[in-house]
Design a protein with these regions (language model features):
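Acidic catalytic loop of the alpha/beta-hydrolase fold
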Residues: 116-120, 148-149
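Short beta-strand/loop motif that positions the catalytic acidic residue
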Residues: 105-106, 111-113, 117
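Glycine-rich nucleophile elbow surrounding the catalytic serine of serine-hydrolase chemistry
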Residues: 28-38
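Short alpha-helix in the alpha/beta-hydrolase fold that links the catalytic acid
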Residues: 107, 121-130
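Alpha/beta-hydrolase fold nucleophile elbow
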Residues: 19-30
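Alpha/beta-hydrolase active-site loop
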Residues: 1-19
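Hydrolase active-site cap/lid region
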Residues: 38-92
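Catalytic histidine-centered segment of alpha/beta-hydrolase-like enzymes
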Residues: 145-156
Length: 170
């Protein structure tokens, strides 16, 4: 879910720095995006820029979205799963909120989102983007994409978005 995985992000950055790489750009999709956002917000990494795809807004909301997708009653089940999932994994899941982590992200950031994503709502995406404090933030939307790998399905458009973002960093 991206909570403890923030430490994995630190491990990767530490390795890259040890190998003398200085211009570190982090890329993450879904849970990976949330892990990057947490790692940056908790100041355990400081990349030069960030590229993220379809991060969820809050742990509670992402659980609710999945219950809705399965036509399972959201209340009280989503609350119980958020509570119990966090408890058995030794963290308070109600505080795992990438939309809050966004308030600490000052690096240039490209955020991509699929308009047909059933797991992450447009409202969550807009809130995250609004909360980003970066002066160089870009939101690209794929109108026909769901919660998926955009490169696989929209390769040329994805590559163009990445290239434009990276070229603007120079």
């Amino acid at each position: 879910v991206g909570f403890f995985e923030a430490e994995n992000v630190k491990t990767v950055v530490d390795f890259a720095q040890k190998e003398s790489h200085q211009n570190i750009i982090l890329y993450g999709n879904s849970m990976g995006a949330s892990a990057i956002m947490r790692a940056v917000a908790k100041e355990i990494v400081n990349p030069s820029s960030i590229i993220i795809e379809c991060p969820f807004g809050t742990m509670q909301q992402t659980v609710e979205n999945r219950f809705k997708n399965m036509n399972v009653p959201i209340f009280p089940m989503a609350n119980l799963l958020t509570f119990w999932g966090g408890t058995i994994n030794n963290f308070w899941a109600f505080n795992h909120n990438p939309e809050d982590y966004a308030k600490s992200i000052k690096q240039p950031i490209l955020m991509m989102y699929g308009k047909k994503d059933l797991n992450v709502t447009n409202q969550e995406t807009q809130q995250i983007f609004k909360n980003l404090i970066s002066e160089n933030k870009v939101l690209k939307t794929f109108p026909e994409a769901g919660h998926e790998n955009y490169l696989n399905r929209f390769g040329e458009e994805w590559k163009e978005n990445i290239s434009l973002f990276l070229n603007d960093l120079k």
